[in-house]
Amino acid sequence: MSLSRKSAVLLSALLSLTSLGVAGAAEAPKTEIKGAAILDHPCGKVAVKQMGLIHAGKFEEANKLTSKEMQEQWKGLSAKDREMMTGMMKEMSKSEADFAKDIKASGVLVIEGNKGTLTIEQKHKDDNGSSTEKMTQRYTIDGDKCLISR
């Protein structure tokens, strides 16, 4: 085998190993937390805190628990749109205690790298049939700090 051929084979072997390493590095480990344990995680704590602030009508304080991007989007809304959004959020919000109860009953928090997603799915049955209510909230994680991003 000529020197240039050996170099080409070695180079392609190295490149294939490098691409495998990069692919493996891109996949962050996934952690799933369920029920009451979510309330001990920074994302669970910020979720409950923000819900309580919204329920109490403290929207400016609640907004401080969101990512910079969300805060900028909020500032970009017209006063009329912000008023409409705050009305809808307050109407759909729950007390901290009720929201914590929902998380304990059916919450699932998935952490992947510096991102998190909380999903709460509740099934309801009555004389008219059944329905499912699903709430999803996304987070950006920086160390032990968790901010709502969607």
Regions found by a protein language model. Name each.
Residues S12-S19:
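Bacterial N-terminal signal peptides
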Residues L20-A25:
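Sec/Tat signal peptide C-region and signal peptidase I cleavage site
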Residues A26-A56:
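Short, low-complexity N-terminal intrinsically disordered segments enriched in polar/charged residues
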Residues Q50, A62, Y139:
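Hydrophobic pocket/interface hotspot
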Residues E83-T132:
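Surface-exposed, charged secondary-structure patches
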